[in-house]
């Protein structure tokens, strides 16, 4: 595809679609992006109840760096160095995200990130954004799309060499591309939903809790996480069942809201002066996983991001994996002059790993809900980190591989499983060795501190 200038249509100007457009434009192609929503940089655009904070990690950072955007994005982010776990009894415990200084996450506002990516893509020659434009049909054989203004009016037709479906979990491109094919499709809704809440800046202008961390309030029937913002506030996401005794439906009066938070998240309730209003007014979002195949048709159509592999948000990899799609698609289009071969290589390179990511995201939901506050979980994580410090070339915790490297997801899980088998076989002997190593490390630190005071 890199041999001549071609016309590409991208359907969806979200994060994945806009970044894909930028990569394709850098290959020298003419790119039209059609998006049913308004320009995200305009006052009319809204988050539609979706999470407005995102956790940027290594895969997403690599993708942004590939088009020269990383430094600018990091200026608009807040580093998250730890996961701070809040217990119902008011206790707080920090769990480091990694063992090395650079192993941190970055919290960024969705609206700021998408504005940066859209503006960068729009600045490229041959790139045109068409907002408030709804895809009504796709001819997968010819690459012809028909698009109508959302406000009504005459539809237009565009024929492209390649159509990129970046139109989200309920993708119209996917539906029309797979129509009549022997296609697999599975959609799994979690019985839980989510609602966005806020911990505002304190009356003194200072953050009400430690800012450079992801805060987690775990619980079997409800859990909450909070991402930091540059203004000192935090954006909270409350996860719980849609229906039932402990659910969003049950939070139907101010008294019910306050009683629920005082029992479940007592230290958070006092930090949220607008809690009742936000619970009442903010919409409940849905959580869904999508697995599908194929991701492409011949040399004409390809899917990226949620259109190909939506996952639950509990590993913080939805945006990062979508950005990684853009990198791999770019690499495949460069490596294979035959576009059909390039699209096949892209799907083969990505799908096995995004399937594993879906499983990891579900498992991490269970960890955040049930296990992250337990001492056994903390001890296991601490042992994992210690082994990584002692054996940096041989031992890497699963979370570190997923969040802080670009090791493909399935390869990361396979390596983590091998490490787990080693621990199980070694049993008490290795546990003792790790304990002795930890003691020795603590003694070394103590000696250094005493020497520094002399």
Curated annotation (Swiss-Prot):
Top-level enzyme category: oxidoreductase
Cofactor names: FAD
Any single biological process term in GO: quinolinate biosynthetic process
Gene3D superfamilies: FAD/NAD(P)-binding domain
Family indicated by similarity: Belongs to the aromatic-ring hydroxylase family. KMO subfamily.
Annotated EC: 1.14.13.9
Free-text function comment from the UniProt entry: Catalyzes the hydroxylation of L-kynurenine (L-Kyn) to form 3-hydroxy-L-kynurenine (L-3OHKyn). Required for synthesis of quinolinic acid.
Keyword Thylakoid: no
Protein name per its UniProtKB record: Kynurenine 3-monooxygenase
UniProt-listed Pfam families: FAD_binding_3
Highest taxon of source: Bacteria
PANTHER family named in the record: KYNURENINE 3-MONOOXYGENASE
SUPFAM superfamilies: FAD/NAD(P)-binding domain
Pathways involved: Cofactor biosynthesis; NAD(+) biosynthesis; quinolinate from L-kynurenine: step 1/3
Reaction catalysis annotation: L-kynurenine + NADPH + O2 + H(+) = 3-hydroxy-L-kynurenine + NADP(+) + H2O
Keywords: FAD, Flavoprotein, Monooxygenase, NADP, Oxidoreductase, Pyridine nucleotide biosynthesis
Gene Ontology molecular function: FAD binding; kynurenine 3-monooxygenase activity
InterPro entries tied to this protein: FAD-bd, FAD/NAD-bd_sf, Kynurenine_monooxygenase
Keyword Lyase on entry: no
């Amino acid at each position: 595809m890199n041999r001549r200038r071609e016309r590409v249509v991208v359907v969806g100007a979200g994060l994945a679609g806009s970044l894909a457009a930028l990569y394709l434009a850098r290959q020298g192609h003419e790119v039209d992006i059609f998006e049913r929503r308004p320009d995200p940089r305009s006052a009319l655009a809204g988050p539609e109840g979706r999470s407005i904070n995102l956790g940027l990690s290594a895969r997403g950072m690599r993708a942004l760096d590939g088009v020269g955007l990383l430094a600018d994005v990091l200026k608009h982010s807040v580093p998250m160095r730890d996961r701070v776990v809040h217990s119902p009894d008011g206790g707080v415990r920090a769990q480091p995200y990694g063992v090395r200084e650079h192993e941190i996450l970055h919290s960024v506002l969705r609206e700021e990130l998408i504005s940066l990516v859209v503006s960068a893509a729009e600045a490229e020659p041959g790139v045109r954004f068409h907002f408030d434009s709804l895809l009504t049909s796709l001819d997968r054989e010819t690459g012809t799309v028909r698009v109508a203004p959302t406000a009504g009016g005459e539809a237009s037709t565009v024929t492209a060499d390649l159509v990129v479906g970046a139109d989200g979990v309920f993708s119209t491109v996917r539906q029309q591309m797979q129509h009549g094919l022997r296609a697999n499709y599975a959609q799994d809704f979690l019985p839980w939903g989510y609602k966005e809440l806020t911990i505002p800046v304190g009356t003194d202008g200072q953050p009400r809790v430690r800012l450079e961390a992801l805060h987690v309030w775990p619980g079997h029937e409800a859990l909450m996480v909070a991402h930091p913002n540059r203004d000192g506030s935090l954006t909270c996401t409350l996860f719980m069942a849609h229906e039932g005794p402990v659910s969003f439906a049950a939070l139907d009066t101010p008294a019910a809201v306050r009683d629920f938070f005082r029992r479940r998240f007592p230290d958070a309730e006092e930090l949220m002066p607008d809690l009742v209003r936000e619970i009442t007014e903010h919409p409940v979002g849905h959580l869904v996983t999508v697995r599908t195949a194929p991701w492409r048709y011949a040399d004409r159509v390809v899917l990226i991001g949620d259109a190909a592999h939506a996952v639950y948000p509990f590993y913080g990899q939805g945006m990062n994996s979508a950005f990684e799609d853009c990198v791999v698609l770019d690499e495949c289009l460069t490596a294979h002059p035959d576009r059909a071969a390039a699209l096949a290589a892209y799907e083969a390179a990505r799908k096995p790993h995004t399937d594993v990511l879906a499983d990891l995201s579900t498992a991490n939901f269970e960890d955040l809900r049930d296990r992250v506050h337990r001492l056994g979980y903390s001890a296991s994580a601490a042992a994992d980190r210690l082994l990584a410090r002692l054996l940096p070339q041989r031992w890497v915790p699963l979370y570190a591989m997923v969040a802080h490297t670009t090791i493909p997801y399935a390869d990361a899980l396979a390596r983590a499983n091998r490490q787990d088998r080693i621990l199980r076989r070694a049993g008490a002997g290795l546990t003792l060795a790790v304990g002795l190593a930890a003691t020795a490390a603590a003694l070394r630190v103590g000696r250094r501190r005493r020497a520094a005071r002399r």
